[in-house]
């Protein structure tokens, strides 16, 4: 066993973060980032740091491992298409049930809520479940407070909307807080996409940019969970670089393969 594998085994055993689910190159990038921050050059040295019960570092590492790149209205062409999906659903179903799977710090489900409101949907008929495995990320999501940084301008991200000020409140020069009108549409809860039970009856599931970080053998369980959570005719949206494996591909028809939106078909 290499020093890196020993480190991963410790992380999984002592923190509960399932390193075995994730692509090893992804884990290496994230762990190495923490090592550089702490001035540690060897995996064995970083393991010693964690073994010394450095709770702060363990928390920082878990945050680094769990939270992926996220922003409001990431890939605008996808959100333009999703607006049409929501309008179509509003004409065909009484209540629109949406699941944002692996929602990280909440920007995706809040984007979905803002989009629904911006499209003129009745908020009483829209319900969004947002789940993630990381409790700290969920706490940040529930707070709904986001700050612009040098590399991520929240104002630019919200520029997809005509009137973003209807959905967020400014707090100082850099911070934005999602208002209650948006928050009321979203419920957050913890869920593990690999080991957790499927949901049921959803009209739309967003599972974007999740599988690109996951080891190949666990991608199928994730997409199996997602497909079982959609009603017949429900919509699935994946990340721009993600594809459906053959084992679940037959359960879907591509609505627009360029932007990875699919419809659930009846089981045969």
From Swiss-Prot:
Disulfide bonds: none
Matches recorded under Pfam families: CheR, CheR_N
Presence of the UniProt keyword Transferase in the record: yes
InterPro entries linked to this entry: Bact_Chemotaxis_MeTrfase (IPR050903), CheR_C (IPR022642), CheR_MeTrfase (IPR000780), CheR_N (IPR022641), CheR_N_sf (IPR036804), SAM-dependent_MTases_sf (IPR029063)
GO terms of molecular function: protein-glutamate O-methyltransferase activity
Catalysed transformations (reactions): L-glutamyl-[protein] + S-adenosyl-L-methionine = [protein]-L-glutamate 5-O-methyl ester + S-adenosyl-L-homocysteine
Enzyme Commission number(s) of this protein: 2.1.1.80
Null allele phenotype: Mutants show lack of Htr methylation.
Residues that coordinate or bind S-adenosyl-L-methionine: 68, 70, 74, 108, 132, 192-193, 208-209
Top-level taxon in the UniProt lineage: Archaea
Every CheR-type methyltransferase domain range: 1-265
Swiss-Prot/TrEMBL keywords: Chemotaxis, Methyltransferase, S-adenosyl-L-methionine, Transferase
Any one Gene Ontology BP term: methylation
Free-text function comment from the UniProt entry: Catalyzes the methylation of several Htr transducer proteins (methyl-accepting chemotaxis proteins) to form gamma-glutamyl methyl ester residues.
Name listed for the protein in its UniProt record: Chemotaxis protein methyltransferase
Species this chain originates from: Halobacterium salinarum (strain ATCC 29341 / DSM 671 / R1)
């Amino acid at each position: 066993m290499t020093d890196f594998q020993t480190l991963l085994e410790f992380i999984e055993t002592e923190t509960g973060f399932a390193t075995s689910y994730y692509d090893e190159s992804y884990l290496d990038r994230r762990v190495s980032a923490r090592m550089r921050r702490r001035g540690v050059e060897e995996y064995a040295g970083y393991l010693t740091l964690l073994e010394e019960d450095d709770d702060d570092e363990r928390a920082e590492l878990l945050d680094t491992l769990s939270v992926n790149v996220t922003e409001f209205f990431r890939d605008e062409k996808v959100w333009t298409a999703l607006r049409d999906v929501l309008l179509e659903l509003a004409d065909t179903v009484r209540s629109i049930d949406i699941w944002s799977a692996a929602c990280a710090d909440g920007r995706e489900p809040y984007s979905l809520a803002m989009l629904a409101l911006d499209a003129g949907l009745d908020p009483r008929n829209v319900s969004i479940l947002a789940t993630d495995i990381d409790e700290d990320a969920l706490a940040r999501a529930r707070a709904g407070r986001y700050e612009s940084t040098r590399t991520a301008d929240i104002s630019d991200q919200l520029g997809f909307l005509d009137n973003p000020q209807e959905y967020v409140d400014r707090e100082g020069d850099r911070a934005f807080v999602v208002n209650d009108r948006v928050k009321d549409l979203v419920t957050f809860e913890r869920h593990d996409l690999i080991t957790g039970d499927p949901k049921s009856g959803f009209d739309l599931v967003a599972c974007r940019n999740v599988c690109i970080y996951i080891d190949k053998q666990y991608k199928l369980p994730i997409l199996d969970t997602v497909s079982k959570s959609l009603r017949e005719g429900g919509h699935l949206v994946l990340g721009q670089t993600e594809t459906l494996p053959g084992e679940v591909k037959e359960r879907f028809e591509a609505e627009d393969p360029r932007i990875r939106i699919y419809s659930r078909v009846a089981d045969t």
